[in-house]
Amino acid sequence: MSDRVNTTRLQEMARAYTVSAVLYAALDVGLFTHVSNGCVKEADLANATGLRRIDIDRLVSCALSLDLLDWDGEELRNQADVEAYLVEGKERYAGPWMMFTRPDVPGWFEMTERMRTPKSSRLGMYDDLTVESARQYHKATSSLSLIHI
């Protein structure tokens, strides 16, 4: 073990939002579902997702670097947890839960400003809960109940 101090951990924190962004983009275009359904080459994924080839290359490269995807010879495949939980139509699909807090992201980047306001910030979603947002919340949390099946 090295006692050398470096910035690696801090850099990972500073760029952690990119991990969420890649996951959201992959779910937006159904990347993992397409791979599971046999689109295992980038050209096929570009056609299936409607993304430009350069952008599917970028998304796949990011997903590979995050261990969401892997290579099986010349073909892409989902990692086991991705296959189990992020393929739409599968029994344990947890996509709604993964995406549920996405609207909260901008608020986290306003954290400093919110803490500096004279009025205390509200925590939680319940003050602004609508019938539609309650339905989305129920859909998201019910997808969680399937995870342990």
Where are the regions a protein language model picked out?
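Short N-terminal amphipathic alpha-helix/helix-capping patch enriched in small hydrophobics
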Residues: 27-28, 41
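Basic/polar N-terminal segments that are highly enriched at the extreme N-terminus
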Residues: 1-5
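Short, Lys/Arg-enriched N-terminal segment that forms or immediately precedes the first helix
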Residues: 6-20
